[in-house]
């Protein structure tokens, strides 16, 4: 199945503690989860590793979020939108369902 949400897409969170926030997808995991910049931040206790030059402490990092809890953001309408697929000139392209514009 083709991916409706891909890397570098701007998404908006529909459910959870970060509901309503927007961010850019930095990674799509094969388990159906996404890592979105600035969303679902968790504190990780990092053990120091002098061989790699890593300082210890508590660091904040993005945790994966379920893909069903986000929707692609349509900048033309300023709202969350659904994505469809169609063929144009032999190429399969994604488009927004609300206004039929192509996803960039």
Curated annotation (Swiss-Prot):
> Is Nucleus among this UniProt entry's keywords?
no
Name the HAMAP family on file.
Ribosomal_uL24_B
InterPro entries per the record?
KOW, Rib_uL2_dom2, Ribosomal_uL24, Ribosomal_uL24_KOW, Translation_prot_SH3-like_sf
Subunit description: Part of the 50S ribosomal subunit.
Fetch the SUPFAM superfamilies from UniProt.
Answer: Translation proteins SH3-like domain (SSF50104)
Name listed for the protein in its UniProt record: Large ribosomal subunit protein uL24
**What are its GO biological-process terms?**
translation
Regarding protein family, the annotation reads: Belongs to the universal ribosomal protein uL24 family.
The GO molecular function terms of this record are:
rRNA binding; structural constituent of ribosome
Residue ranges of the TM segments: none
Main function: One of two assembly initiator proteins, it binds directly to the 5'-end of the 23S rRNA, where it nucleates assembly of the 50S subunit. One of the proteins that surrounds the polypeptide exit tunnel on the outside of the subunit.
- Which terms are listed as keywords in the entry? Ribonucleoprotein, Ribosomal protein, RNA-binding, rRNA-binding
A cellular component annotation (GO) from this entry: ribosome
Q: Output the PANTHER family linked to this UniProt entry.
A: MITOCHONDRIAL RIBOSOMAL PROTEIN L24
Gene behind this protein = rplX
């Amino acid at each position: 199945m083709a991916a409706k949400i891909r890397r570098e897409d701007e998404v908006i969170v529909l459910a959870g503690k970060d509901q309503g926030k927007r961010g850019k997808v930095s990674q799509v995991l094969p388990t159906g989860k996404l890592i979105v910049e600035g969303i679902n931040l968790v504190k990780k206790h990092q053990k120091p590793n002098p061989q790699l030059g890593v300082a210890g402490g508590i660091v904040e990092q993005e945790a994966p979020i379920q893909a069903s809890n986000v929707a692609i953001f349509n900048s033309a309408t300023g709202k969350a939108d659904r994505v469809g697929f169609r063929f144009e000139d032999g190429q399969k392209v994604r488009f927004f369902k609300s206004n039929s514009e192509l996803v960039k």
